[in-house]
Amino acid sequence: MRWVDRHGGLLKTPATEAQTLAVLQRPHIASKLPPAYLAGVRGLFSRAELVPIVTPVVACRDPTDDKFLELAVNGAADMIVTGDLDLLVLHPFRGIPIIDPAAFVRGVGPAGEPETR
């Protein structure tokens, strides 16, 4: 969460916010997260930039994930961070890197690729 504060904002649409929060509350995921995690994510979303969707995107093998691609394209995102394999297989999507959360936590370089240390 500090990375977002230092390096730029988080983008959202009402649909991406709702789906992200719903996924994090699934029992098999919520049981692995610290109690304050969901509150922290909600705090991030409260400061996120709301992006209007002007250009629809239909590209993902799971159509429910197209909303995240639409957000990235319409918001000119620097990257997409996800653990969803249906999105990860599209890396990069229209020049936007798609990385998993572990790569994001390790830190990313200016081009959106994991830094080498």
Question: Model-found features: residue ranges?
Answer:
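Mid-chain, well-packed structural core segment of small domains
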Residues: 46-81
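Hydrophobic/aromatic ligand-binding patch that stacks against planar heteroaromatic rings
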Residues: 2, 71, 90
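Short secondary-structure boundary segments
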Residues: 14-15, 83-85
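Membrane interface segments of multi-pass transport proteins and intramembrane proteases
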Residues: 29-33
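PIN/NYN-family metal-dependent endoribonuclease catalytic core
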Residues: 1-27
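Acidic, PIN/NYN-like endoribonuclease modules and their adjacent C-terminal/linker elements
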Residues: 58, 62, 75, 79, ...
